[in-house]
Amino acid sequence: MASEPLDLTSRDQRSLDSDEAIPLEPCTVVAFIGRTERGPLDEPVAIKGFDHYRRVFGGHCSFSFVSFAVEHFFLHGGETAVVVRVANRAGRALLEVPAGAGVLKLEAREPGGREFLRVSVDYDRVEQQPDRFNLVVQRLGRPSSQLVDDQELFEGVSMNPAAERFVVDALNESELVRLVGPPPLARPDATRSARPGEPIPYLAATVPGTDGEELTDYDVIGSNTEGTGIFALDRCEQVDLLCIPSPPGRDLGSTSFVAATRYCERRRALLVWDPPWSWSSPSAALLGIRTSARASRCALTYFPRVRPRGDVGRYEEGMPASGVVAGLLARRDRRGAWHELPGEESSLKGNLVPAIEVDAPHALALQRAGVNAFVRTEPGVVTFQGDVSLAGPGCAEGWWRRLGVVRLTSFVLRSIEHYTRWVFAAERPEELVIDLERQVWIFLARLQERAALAGSAPDQGFFVRATPRTDSSGVAITLRVGFAAERPNEFLTYDFRFREPTMTTEIVAVAGAERRLG
């Protein structure tokens, strides 16, 4: 189980220094949260493909769209995902192995109705040692199947607490089962075949696992102190996009939206929010977004949902397209977060089509209201259009409604914060300010060369100023950075405050700031 930060970057941050060039095309990490068939609960698991997902979390199921979202993500250009499984009162399967007058009780390590476990016991090569036995634990693809998905073998396990292979210690290493209660006094009875030469029989679960109930907002949000739900992502070094696919026929509540957008704001990430199921037409979507109280520049939404081509009956209302959107954005990021994908590269793939057709006038109206749209541009081609965030009409600064500005800003802040951590272990403290300014100046200059920043000259597109300072708050140095995301000399300005006592960097937006630090 993951307990240390899940580092999905290619370089150990301890090797960073002032000569390290800040990359312009980092890997985009997308997090998915929701119910799955099986897998570890409230643990961030890095996934590199849909086959990998299936091995850890199982396949498609009727109570969740998470598996579809992950599949769509990789199909549309995504490369790195993190999946956090959450559940509401899911139960664990129980296995009871006779052991003389007692019982060895085992339960599934993870809850769920798809944990089809079985065990066998034999005494091969330990017949003369009455406290020892061999235990085989298997997970099957389905009940009574001979297809084994996972298997664990514990050889020479002992019932003696002083033994090196004491059963309690041995089962602590299992990823499939765990011991329930104290072990029996006698070793488990061997599961012998009825006739010589027949396969050794297995014992199935006496109490099956359960998938639990529908998720509540609080299952999704989880606990900050316990590191569950959304907060399990704190163990990830990097999160760029967050998807919480809505369950079949049911919307997640406003509490989930508020918590997720606040979390994304803290992590400089973006929430891909699925549209309500009540958006059954372009007109309903327009009415819905205009009367909705949900707004955040750290989120985007879209319309319509998608479905497999020709499969109208099974998915009449469609399925969430958050995985599609995340995959397209991750693909765009490989060219730079500020780029827009050409139409042919932002199209639906994998035999997916819009659940509802949206014509050009409705698509334009939706985009003006803050909703991106899947639009049929030619026969057989549907593209993702809009480039708008969910900042809403109440946002005073109009540039935050542009998805490109939101993502560029997050990318710049996150990159500077990560790649300037060398400041806390600088080997040349007397040159720290110069080295810091140079590193960030080069990064922003390269962005301007790529047309990510406005202006034809550096002073029109950005500025960098660093000032050493020591005050009661423990700030050792402040770096002020301004960059023009839309128009020359109109800067978004931020202070990076490097705090030595905690070795953390505080990022503060500075409205109407001077280029120099006072």
Task: Map each language-model feature to its residues.
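Small/polar, repeat-rich beta-turn/loop motifs that tile beta-strand-dominated architectures
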Residues: 1-34, 58-76, 101-225, 258, ...
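Structured, hydrophobic secondary-structure cores that serve as assembly/anchoring elements
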Residues: 1-112, 138-141, 231-518
